[in-house]
Amino acid sequence: MKKLTTLLLAGVLALSCVACGGKETKDDPAKKSEGVMTYAEYDAAALESEVVIEAYVQAKQGWWEKEGQGVVTIYAQDKDGAYFIYEMPISKEENDKLTAGTKIKVTGYKAEWSGEVEIIDAKYEVLDGNYVAEATDVTSLLGTDDLIKKQNMFVAFKGMKVEASKDADGNEVAFLYKWNGSGAEGDDLYFNASVNGKTYTFTVESYLCGSDTDVYKAVKNLKIGDTIDMEGFLYWYDGVNPHITSVTVK
């Protein structure tokens, strides 16, 4: 679910989503410059405090202009954890250079929105280095207190069963446009999937993977009862609400 704000997306979404392609090239994500927090230090930092991190861009939502200033929201990760960098000011030209794997240093403030920990008011610097994370399988952590420790990481869910959602008319369907079924083509997709007798909700965030992407099309083709594997980012909104970037029907 999005924050309640009017978003004027500029042009076509500029995606650098891991699931949408791009070659993985490795760097040592454990190295930190002087004065930069480790992930453990960032995790322990108080909300509203200034934080300084180094991480690698894994994906971006669409660049747009907010009150005349270009901004982009970034999913970033290092060896030990992940970061959600919200509406970072950046020009369109510079944003286009932030491809998946790019190393950045970010200074901003730690904040929280409905359980999602993020960095706001961010300033960035591009550094040498490149790293694209492999998906961490967190299927066994669903429903446990340990899942939140992986918040914002690129993760995988395996062997899950598509469960019915109910649309605005009360019909059972495999997915919804928007969380309540009130949307249309191009909006976020919501769908339910279960494992070990428990059902969870997953989202295709349209600002991350729009209607022209493989994952958006794949979710629209799901059938109730399908067994699927998924990859995406472990976003939080009043509980776990993963932003899915890849779906494979078994």
Question: Which ranges hold each PLM region?
Answer:
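C-terminal motif of bacterial Sec signal peptides marking the signal peptidase cleavage site
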Residues: 16-19
